[in-house]
Amino acid sequence: MMENFKHTTVLLDEAVNGLNIRPDGIYIDGTFGRGGHSRLILSQLGEEGRLLAIDRDPQAIAVAQAINDPRFSIIHGPFSALADYVAERELTGKIDGILLDLGVSSPQLDDAERGFSFMRDGPLDMRMDPTRGQSAAEWLQTAEEADIAWVLKTFGEERFAKRIARAIVERNREQPMTRTKELAEVVAAATPVKDKFKHPATRTFQAVRIWVNSELEEIEQALKSSLSVLAPGGRLSIISFHSLEDRIVKRFMREQSRGPQVPAGLPMTEAQLKKLGGRELRALGKLMPGEKEVAENPRARSSVLRIAERTNA
């Protein structure tokens, strides 16, 4: 039975407003979660509008299946495959907006059985979709020390990555870790300098979660796919929660807004320049939560919303 964990959608109005909803438009909510964004989008669509939602979390799918609306459909899978889902429905190049709310959701963090949080003892899992792939425990038990250190450094920006990786491997040799509390304790013991404002396991849990779920690769693939999926004038509205996510989104929007870069002085005909194509996107800026939203929902503090529009290129 699924527990009813509360989820407050971050930047709800801002993200949906960023899509510039047309009543008869076709939209994608690539991260359904508990449906906050989807329900608001549906409330702004007319009878001819359509919303395709995606999530790889079976609990999110269960929530979505309770929505009885002919304009709405839900897909169980990763949002990185959105181009395939759209092609199957013969909607390539016809999507008017894509919304992505990246990272882990509050219900996932708050449910100890999902294994995402060092604050709650539960199985060391961390998979967005517990039916597929390796759990965090399985990966940590089989990975090389150097690989664990690389993941902690790359995806957690953990300065004690090597020391923590060594402690994890040594502990797993003695007795394999299967609980979140065990990993949190090992990391805390291996961290020589503590941050008084942050639990020592924060960066390790983030890094392992990102690795287990291939989160950054998912984002990069979805962004790349969006260019073929969106109609001219279609919008991208993307919420990030940490610098690694935001860096990818920011770089993508900046590069696609600039268009092909031709070295100064390179002799090219007008036909050759035209063949290179123009700007794929027009960046429309970023928004961050206000003081009121952060006070009501502290998890919103680090969020950044970036919006871009597909050009006619």
Swiss-Prot record:
It catalyses: cytidine(1402) in 16S rRNA + S-adenosyl-L-methionine = N(4)-methylcytidine(1402) in 16S rRNA + S-adenosyl-L-homocysteine + H(+). GO terms for cellular component: cytoplasm. Its main location: cytoplasm. Pfam families: Methyltransf_5 (PF01795). Keywords: Cytoplasm, Methyltransferase, rRNA processing, S-adenosyl-L-methionine, Transferase. It is found in: Cytoplasm. Its EC number is 2.1.1.199. SUPFAM superfamilies: Putative methyltransferase TM0872, insert domain, S-adenosyl-L-methionine-dependent methyltransferases. One of its GO terms (biological process) is rRNA base methylation. It comes from the Bacteria. Gene3D superfamilies: Putative methyltransferase TM0872, insert domain (1.10.150.170), Vaccinia Virus protein VP39 (3.40.50.150). GO terms for molecular function: rRNA (cytosine-N4-)-methyltransferase activity. S-adenosyl-L-methionine binds at residues 35-37, 55, 79, 101, 108. InterPro entries: RsmH, SAM-dep_MeTrfase_MraW_recog, SAM-dependent_MTases_sf. Belongs to the methyltransferase superfamily. RsmH family. Specifically methylates the N4 position of cytidine in position 1402 (C1402) of 16S rRNA. This is Ribosomal RNA small subunit methyltransferase H. The lineage of its organism: Bacteria, Pseudomonadati, Pseudomonadota, Gammaproteobacteria, Enterobacterales. The gene is rsmH.
